[in-house]
């Protein structure tokens, strides 16, 4: 998401009038933190003989689990198969029930009652879900592994600065007929499994898709969100809809619109793994774009499960909105911190994800980000988890976090592990100017040299840089936000007379110079 360089409100940044010792909401969250659960068994734990359901909701009056044959009301006999009351362990705040029998691929929700209000919710810890993510699914993950998955390995680099990253979207990667991908797989996970694709499918034409990436020589692809998101109706054709996916619904389930059958929760899991496997077979690592800083709606599964706990709340009862997406999550609250750690390590271990790009990382706190780093470091006995990449958008943003919280923004980056990086907007703008305006910079007119030098050195200058070491600096000229590099050059050099579909040789040269700066700078290109 776009950088919004605004002053934060946490810790020392708040005004005296805003420094209320503890708000009612912060006291409420702190009290719930006393019941924080450390177990690793939240969600549905499946066996052929029985399935145990566990959900953390210490202040709920009652919780029931509802079992369904299908993932939505629009499929066959959509009525509930059964509903069972769950029991509360007051020492852990966890509600649980074990249901005998084989519930494989059955769907479920929870009915959670707070006071006199009961809301139905999916499971925040669900690892599989039905169409549009409205119901969770009981899954045996071992049945979702593609052939050869046991032999699939992480693609890692010894040093972070050895990485080279190319950003892609699952849909954009192959949605055009010109991609040469079969019609059935265009815009889907399985497009990555097709080999020998060329422009328009013409023999001898330029390579496309994974074959193109191999020729490009990149070490990693940073894939825009492919967890389950809410802005696309999975029951409809993906080619008729479009969204990047920065609107999370189910963090631990793959997005269904990218699968060949979004109504079957197990299908999206297997096909997502096939995508990752195909990239690994090509020698390319996968960096997952994760968006833990907000959810698609404020009436999320988190809010329905434990109201006003998982989010930063203003004193008037509204949601903090530093993200610009209407609800900032509260990474400083122990159970959302745990959730982020559990979610990242789950994707790394189950899906063999090789790196994580944290959207609006500056909204998360330093302790949580360092804890995620430690959890990844300890993920494997051979220590290879320490090579899983971590970086994010460390913009300084206004959010109403608990007093004393230190946010993972650029100004606090030196408090993060040296193996947590941040995007360098300074060199980005020094190369070609601001992301959307018509202003010029180094490649157009030779200006902004001081900022460029700092960026080339990986922001590690002791007086002006914000990084401990160059490996914390992600060097780039453009990304999915705002104008692409060439369009920026057209607008800044030729203004209103510029033709965006025309090839200007001087702009091509500027584009090449931009790439040369990124590739030869210290840091992660």
Residue ranges and their predicted role:
Residues 6-21:
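Sec-dependent signal peptide cleavage junction
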Residues 164-166, 221-223, 286-288, 356, ...:
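Hydrophobic faces of well-ordered beta-strands that scaffold small-molecule active sites
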Residues 171-351, 360-361, 365-381, 401:
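Substrate-binding/active-site clefts of carbohydrate-active enzymes
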Residues 56-62, 481:
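Short proline/glycine-enriched turn/loop motifs at strand-loop junctions of beta-rich domains
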Residues 139, 373-376, 385-525:
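Conserved alpha/beta catalytic core and glycan-binding cleft of carbohydrate-active enzymes
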Residues 49-53:
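Structural beta-strand segments of beta-rich domains
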Residues 64-66, 111:
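Beta-strand signatures of extracellular beta-sandwich domains
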């Amino acid at each position: 998401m776009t950088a919004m360089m605004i002053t934060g409100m946490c810790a020392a940044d708040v005004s005296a009038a805003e420094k209320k010792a503890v708000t009612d909401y912060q006291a409420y969250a702190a009290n719930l933190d006393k019941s924080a659960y450390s177990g690793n068994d939240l969600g549905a734990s499946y066996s052929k003989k029985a399935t145990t359901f566990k959900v953390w909701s210490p202040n709920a009056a009652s919780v029931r689990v509802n079992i369904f044959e299908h993932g939505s009301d629009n499929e066959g006999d959509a009525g509930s198969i059964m509903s069972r009351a769950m029991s509360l362990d007051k020492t852990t705040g966890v509600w649980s029930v074990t249901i005998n029998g084989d519930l494989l691929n059955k769907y479920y929700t929870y009915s959670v009652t707070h006071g006199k209000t009961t809301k139905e919710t999916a499971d925040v810890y669900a690892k599989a879900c039905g169409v549009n993510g409205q119901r969770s699914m009981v899954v045996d993950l071992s049945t979702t592994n593609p052939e050869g998955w046991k032999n699939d390995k992480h693609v890692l680099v010894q040093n972070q600065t050895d990485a080279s990253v190319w950003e892609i979207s699952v849909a954009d990667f192959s949605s055009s007929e010109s991609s040469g991908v079969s019609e059935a797989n265009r815009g889907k996970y399985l497009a990555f499994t097709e080999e020998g694709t060329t422009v328009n499918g013409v023999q001898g034409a330029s390579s496309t898709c994974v074959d193109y990436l191999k020729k490009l020589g990149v070490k990693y692809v940073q894939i825009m969100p492919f967890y389950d998101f809410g802005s696309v109706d999975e029951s409809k054709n993906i080619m008729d809809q479009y969204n990047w996916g920065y609107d999370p619904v189910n963090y631990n389930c793959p997005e269904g619109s990218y699968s060949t059958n979004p109504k079957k929760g197990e299908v999206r899991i297997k096909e997502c793994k096939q995508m990752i496997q195909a990239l690994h077979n090509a020698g390319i690592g996968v960096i997952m774009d994760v968006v833990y800083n907000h959810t698609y709606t404020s009436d999320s599964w988190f809010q329905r499960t434990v109201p006003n706990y998982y989010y930063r709340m203003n004193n008037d009862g509204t949601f903090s909105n530093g993200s610009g997406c209407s609800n900032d999550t509260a990474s400083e609250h122990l159970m959302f911190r745990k959730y982020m750690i559990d979610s990242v390590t789950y994707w790394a271990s189950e899906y063999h994800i090789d790196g994580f790009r944290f959207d609006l990382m500056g909204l998360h706190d330093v302790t949580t980000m360092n804890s995620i780093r430690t959890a990844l470091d300890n993920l494997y006995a051979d220590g290879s988890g320490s090579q899983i990449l971590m970086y994010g958008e460390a913009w300084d943003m206004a959010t109403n976090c608990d007093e004393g919280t230190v946010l993972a923004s650029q100004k606090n980056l030196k408090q993060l592990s040296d193996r947590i990086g941040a995007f360098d907007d300074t060199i980005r703008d020094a190369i070609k100017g601001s992301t959307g305006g018509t202003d010029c910079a180094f490649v157009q007119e030779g200006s902004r040299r001081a900022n460029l030098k700092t960026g080339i050195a990986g922001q590690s200058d002791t007086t002006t840089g914000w990084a401990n070491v160059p490996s914390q600096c992600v060097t780039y000229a453009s990304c999915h936000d705002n104008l692409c590099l060439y369009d920026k050059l057209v607008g800044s050099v030729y203004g209103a007379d510029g033709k965006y579909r025309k090839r200007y040789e001087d702009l091509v040269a500027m584009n090449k110079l931009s790439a040369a700066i990124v590739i030869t700078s210290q840091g992660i290109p």
